[in-house]
Amino acid sequence: IPMENQIRKQATVGVFAVGHAVYWGQFPGLLDKLMIYHADFVKLLEKQGVKVVDFGMSDSSERAYEMLDRIKASGVDLLFCNMVTYATSSVFAPIARDSGLPIVLTALQPLANLDYTQANTRMQLENDCICAVPEYMGVAARMNRKIYDVIIGCLYNDEKADGEIAKWCNIAKALHGLK
């Protein structure tokens, strides 16, 4: 077999953020802020030597179904669900059930510590990344779909979380090599 036929393109990971569309009208600017955090997460993935396909925000069940079609057509090797705020499982369940991909949940809050003397609902929603993890895990279990990992930590300057992201990107590379 000629060497050029043995060379494979780089691994591709998919990523999508989850949110709750009801919040956008209640908290002007929240969606934009969360998408900045999502873009920063995408940059963390890109540093790992993988191609990244960003599917954007799933914030309703309708959007989840629309996104699912794009995910299935993309050929990604692994999928990250970026939990940027609380979101109902309806924005995640169709993707988990029908994508056929290994999924890793990421719950990386932007702030290392919340200033509870200044706390408000908006601040909570910007850092509420872990809240829906039990709900998502339960939904996946009821659908007999495995969630391969949950990466919990801070979005910025968190070596442990960065290491876990690197591990899963390396797993995506291995999965790609098996294709």
List each language-model region with its residue ranges.
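An N-terminal assembly and electron-transfer interface module characteristic of large anaerobic redox
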Residues: I1-K179
